[in-house]
Amino acid sequence: MHKLVLKRIKKSRYLYFMIAPVVIWYLVFCYAPMFGLVIAFKEYDIYEGVANSPFIGLLQFRSFFSSIYFWRLIRNTFLISFYGLIFGFPAPIILALLFNELKDGRFKKITQTISYLPHFISTVIIVGMFTTFLAPETGLINNIIDALGGERIYFLSEPKYFRSLYVILDIWRSVGWGSIIYLAALSNVETELYEACVIDGGGYWRQLFHITLPGIAPTVVIMLILRIGQLMTVGYETIILMYSPSTYETGDVISTYVYRVGLIDSNYSFSSAVGMFNSIISMTLLVCANSISKRFGETSLW
């Protein structure tokens, strides 16, 4: 048995060499830091080290739960993620369906490439472009509003606009890249089904609702489960570049709070406790969504 395993490894050694950097990256940057979660239960001192720092149990968690920012962070994180789920999740599916209907191969490739480009542009550049468009004095959007007789709006300084602006920016950046997996799913739908539907007199909408959407349903369900697992997770990079103290009321989320408390205020134990709480909530949502999908359907992650 041992020799058989070694023989298989030797036979596929080039594949193992190719995947080794990815495995090492995950071990070093994703799994190894998990050992540092113990500082969430300690009064961590950088000079004393993890082992010698005093153990304080759940004190950091209780401090967070009693914080004046707790409910604001929960509300903002949930609402921004929820809006992203409602408006952002269907966007790549719709775009993939539109791409799938394009008959001109060259035009299809060009439009797909254009839609993928924002994903590869630096977040700093993306937010910089967005800020320029929304600038109150020289921004394109405000110039259009002014030309139509309206008053210029300070979009990035008004709390009521922040969540909508973030969701719009996130959709614009990720919709093209997100459509790739749905295009792959669409390519696996059997063409014979469409031909049979046409023979039976079925039009576009009938093909869409009876063939196309059911054909990609397993992929949609898997992606939805993963998205629900991220319902309490909002990337801090874009928000940090977009928000200011004037928009904390609607834009401050758990990840940005962890960044400020941990890296700026150097309160590592408290920020670790907050991050751990967020991870537990995300894992719980993922398990619940997967269990519901497994109970009522045939598609699940495990």
Show which residues each predicted segment covers.
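N-terminal hydrophobic targeting signals that begin at the initiator methionine
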Residues: 1-2
